């Protein structure tokens, strides 16, 4: 298959990164990639979706990954997977010899191994420059569910209409379920039995980089997990703090221990981000050197500094995120052409063990099986967002009153970076706005 043909199939079928920011997958297909890398590092604590999906559909996913390798002409296809995922590794080893040029790379159980910059270094030894893209190093990264969605688009002619989501923590029956896009978080949580605390908080995504959601929020193409947490949990409390309070606390109790840059994954790969210098400058209104502020652009927001490193429970990640947002609003782009310094010699000893991270965050007791159930959950109504990806929102091609069937395109890719959106249920369109489409099931 030619690259352009595969790009068109992927774009029209709405395949984007099934996690993170939802980068349109078709844009990653280029003959500049001499290595393609599958991310099965399950970056966040408690998440098990990717290892489950890869174990269940090992052959289909590997076959598709090999097809991508041949299409772009990559010399090597690497599956990055944590060495503790024994059952999934066994499933992969049953087929690995069928795919020339494909190999497994076993990873340590540390956080944030799923950060693509970290993963690329671990699997290939290549360092992506600060603010750069993986393809500059000849690498294209795909996660497991994304590759499975490519398989469904190419082999089964099925667009992306549903999402696998894990529901864990304060629920009676932790589970990973397949749900239609646009259903509510509450409907997903209901599949895990009953909640085990009063007034639970829905934490969408992983505990390190996730957000607090509302029960009525719709599931999107990037929704990986819902953590049901007590309202007084440490993670919830950290997420609810305000920037003004965070800044005052930094000014009054930062002890200048320097642990935040010592453990910062990007800093240890030679990137110029330095949380300690930023906190020192920001908390003292010190603008004599602007580099600590400008270098905030290179923060990955992994949260190691804020959730693990700081002995004073300060919030470098949150304040850096505010700075990044302010720079964007002011039209200040990250410096271009910045080259990384040499990788820290002590980097191997500065990795954050995931088991220790879970203990520090009060999550160890939630680390339980969440069995994968593939039967599609049935709902009565969906609210499908037109922007579930990086780039321009899709443009609606249906109107209120139209009858649609599951899998039908309801919004076409816009000009520029964009993908199609499809009906996740069959029914009647009841509302169309510039942000979403509502479909009621008959």
Task: Tell where the protein language model's regions lie, with residue ranges.
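Hydrophobic alpha-helical positions that pack around
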Residues: 75-78, 83-185, 191-198, 206, ...
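Flanking helices and flexible, charged tails adjoining ferredoxin-like Fe-S electron-transfer domains
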Residues: 2, 19, 46, 125, ...
